[in-house]
Swiss-Prot record:
The protein's name in its UniProt record: Translocator protein BipB
Main location: secreted
Region span, Disordered: 58-95
Alphabetical list of InterPro entries matching this protein: BipB-like_C (IPR006972), IpaB/BipB/SctE_N (IPR032391), T3SS_SctE/BipB (IPR003895)
Amino acid composition bias (Basic and acidic residues), ranges on this chain: 66-84
Name of the gene this protein is made from: bipB
Location within or outside the cell: Secreted; Host membrane
Transmembrane domains' residue ranges: 355-375, 401-421, 430-450
Organism: Burkholderia pseudomallei (strain K96243)
GO cellular component: extracellular region; host cell membrane; membrane
Family to which the UniProt record says this protein belongs: Belongs to the SctE/SipB/YopB family.
Keywords: Coiled coil, Host membrane, Membrane, Secreted, Transmembrane, Transmembrane helix, Virulence
Function: Plays a role in the bacterium-induced formation of multinucleated giant cell (MNGC), which is formed after host cell fusion, as well as in the intercellular spreading of bacteria and in the induction of apoptosis in macrophages. May act in concert with other effector proteins to induce fusion of host cell membranes.
Amino acid sequence: MSSGVQGGPAANANAYQTHPLRDAASALGTLSPQAYVDVVSAAQRNFLERMSQLASEQCDAQPAAHDARLDDRPALRAPQERDAPPLGASDTGSRASGAAKLTELLGVLMSVISASSLDELKQRSDIWNQMSKAAQDNLSRLSDAFQRATDEAKAAADAAEQAAAAAKQAGADAKAADAAVDAAQKRYDDAVKQGLPDDRLQSLKAALEQARQQAGDAHGRADALQADATKKLDAASALATQARACEQQVDDAVNQATQQYGASASLRTPQSPRLSGAAELTAVLGKLQELISSGNVKELESKQKLFTEMQAKREAELQKKSDEYQAQVKKAEEMQKTMGCIGKIVGWVITAVSFAAAAFTGGASLALAAVGLALAVGDEISRATTGVSFMDKLMQPVMDAILKPLMEMISSLITKALVACGVDQQKAELAGAILGAVVTGVALVAAAFVGASAVKAVASKVIDAMAGQLTKLMDSAIGKMLVQLIEKFSEKSGLQALGSRTATAMTRMRRAIGVEAKEDGMLLANRFEKAGTVMNVGNQVSQAAGGIVVGVERAKAMGLLADVKEAMYDIKLLGDLLKQAVDAFAEHNRVLAQLMQQMSDAGEMQTSTGKLILRNARAV
């Protein structure tokens, strides 16, 4: 009891709690299968070595009084009779014999273990040699097949080359035969023209037929040889393809053998330690995350490249459409300016014609010319000050009531005729509008020269409409301002004096050219008036045609502007798609990171639980 008290807790401890292999045994549950096998094998070797060592000590030295055991535990002996000799008094021979037997047993055991290891190594070596021989035989077989295919392909290529040479020679012979036929035909034709005797013609004809027969035979041989050459060439191509396939098989077999029997062969290297289930699953998920992340990165890069290329193309198209739009707008502006200049020039020419007519009609025509000049000057002043042309407003009822319906009717008829002939609807309408304006102008000019009553009626309508519009214009604020401007302009520029001087000059010019009679003056005045009417109508027609052309150019410009806006929308859409791709990439990575974090937390929790269980088990 005293010894137990003095020893403290160590004296009362269980023998298994103080055993030196306790920690190693506790660690067995956390080892991998391969590490477990290594630990058990090492323990067996240490046990056998210890047994051999103790047996040798007992054989060489005197036995101890306490008869020590191999596991350092006290030996238990059966009770003996008092008359029996003590166990220590037994002769040494028996002990030595027992130790020798134990040593012999251990030697046999080690030899068996070594023999089993050697047998296993031999079996693996045999397997390795067999596999190597099989791979070598396979490579030899594939190499022989490749060599045969190469030889056959080479022979077929040589045969095809020879056949091609023969076909070429046959073709040359056929050409020579054709030349002979042409020569025979020429000799026969010359003989016919020269009127040679019939027997001579018959011989030449027979020679011609023979040449034709030989040429036909030569062409037949050439075609046959060419077909044979083509066939052999196809066969050579097929054999070459087969040889390439054999070469690919040899390369694949060599690569497979290199991978299987190289430095990383599983039969020559020990197996890597296997992971536990959770660790292996975590490793697999990590690899999966790596693959998915790599795929997402590649997908994002491909989408970014695609969207960038599409944006660049759309920007180039947008720039092109913008340049075309600017060109169309500029063209329309230039056309409008050109037609405006033409209209102004024609207007001033008409004014000049009116002044010329004044020389032959006297004061009335001169007054009308002065009014025309005043209206022209007033129109320019009004356009410069207010930006509005009252002459355009005066001519608008004429265009709406007379010229425009006539132009629309003619244009409709021309359009229907063009559509019936198969012309496109849009092109037919454009051509009809232009031709309608031209035909209307020509008709009015012709009618003006003829002086028909219908034109007089139209002219009366035009005069009534213009008179009404002129009355309204004069009553309006613009008309009053125009009258004031004209009066001021007359006072400042001396238009009245200019009018009187012009009348005197016109009278002198009328007398100078010999127009004394009133009828002659009226005739010339009528002619000048017709010329002015024709030019005025031509001016209106040209202005209408110019307006149509300007409208067409503006329509094209509007179409280009629509294309520009569509391209801008496409660029914005591509930017939105690229942004969505980036957001999807970030979302995928976030989900994968969250999944791996959850797996890591689960593994950490499992490890902590295992450690806690082992710690509690050790305390038992």
